Amino acid sequence: MAGRNIDEKLRCSFCNKTQDQVKKLIAGHNGVYICDECVEICSDILDEEFETEADAKEVVDGMNINLLKPKQIKEFLDDYVIGQDEAKKVLAVAVYNHYKRIMSQSDLDVELQKSNILMLGPTGSGKTFLAQNLARLLNVPFAIADATTLTEAGYVGEDVENILLKLIQAADYDVEKAQYGIIYIDEIDKITKKSENVSITRDVSGEGVQQALLKILEGTIASVPPQGGRKHPQQELIPIDTTNILFICGGAFDGLEKIIESRMDKSSIGFNSELKEKSNDDVGEMFHKALPQDLIKFGLIPEFVGRVPVVVSLDSLDEEALVRILKEPKNAIIKQYQALFGLDEVALEFTDEAVEAVAHKSFERKTGARGLRSILESVMNEVMYEIPSDETISKCIITKEAVEGSAKPLLEYRTDAVKKAQ
């Protein structure tokens, strides 16, 4: 075997410089060499990477994120959200894993992928409220965005980057802090593809928006206009890394239960046959059986479904649950009104029949927990108008008749006389 030519100069295997062009050439196995200049470059790269990791850890530590165990997270949610036990468990685990991943990034050899969340549930079932309480518990910035306002770039409407601006604003323009926040995108079911068939018309608020959301959901350096609106060349943009932002997408997904039922081949023959009317309970049960293929059939593109691997199904709220929502949580609506009346030194009381009547109205309107406050506002608006001007009122009693509109709330006066509100 021929030996090395003695006139052949040794070279760095990385930059190809000869031994005469560098100060030092270090030999490795199998004739591999590296020069002092390449060693210095590699050292700088590693220092920069470690410094970035240290900076990120410093930001996370400085935020005082209150990371509790999944059981503790669920117990906290139990104080504010009635029912939805399975959904709370899934959310607790997903949120715990997300922030545990962030806090342990520099300690792991394996890169853990982010798991964004998709919540399925009828209007008023508590999707937004769950997300809000999670952010409050964790002490991280939180923003809510409406998917229906988003359009593809170049069309009238908001760019997807405007979602990130809301989070930056929630963090008081502290971008580092915003990069570890939570964004809840509501009405995500409204940006589904209008049809499985290719159309000649442009679907500017459907598939195109889903495509635009993919990068920020997965993790990218996005450029955000500081004042919102469309980006233009002269504008100075705010860069933000979305890698560690937790995205929770929610929607009512009206009609998804029919797709699930058709797949399961229950109560129907053939996919497009008419399906029987389902009760709210049946719909909730069907949502628990949703598979990625059902969501794709509904109109979410496969890539989008892949970016939201954690699917949480919320149950429809029955009248009993609505009654509990009115009375039991720490910040129950009735407790809020009682505190409000207390500021005017007036006691507020609801009869059991009145509470049931409010729950019944909301259930009939199919507005869920969201409709409870508007019903109470309409019942008590007149008396809330009168009370601040009449210091003799000591107590207000809301009856079933007051809720139904056939009578006014009862007022007790400091003279102990009981009269109807005039």
Swiss-Prot record:
Protein residues bound to Zn(2+): C12, C15, C35, C38
Cross-referenced InterPro entries: AAA+_ATPase (IPR003593), ATP-dep_Clp_protease_ClpX (IPR050052), ATPase_AAA_core (IPR003959), Clp_ATPase_C (IPR019489), Clp_protease_ATP-bd_su_ClpX (IPR004487), ClpX_bact (IPR046425), P-loop_NTPase (IPR027417), Znf_CppX_C4 (IPR010603)
Keyword rRNA processing in annotation: no
GO-annotated cellular components: HslUV protease complex
CDD domains: RecA-like_ClpX
Keywords: ATP-binding, Chaperone, Metal-binding, Nucleotide-binding, Zinc
GO molecular function: ATP binding; ATP hydrolysis activity; ATP-dependent protein folding chaperone; protein dimerization activity; unfolded protein binding; zinc ion binding
Homology family: Belongs to the ClpX chaperone family.
Protein name listed in UniProt: ATP-dependent Clp protease ATP-binding subunit ClpX
Gene from which this protein is expressed: clpX
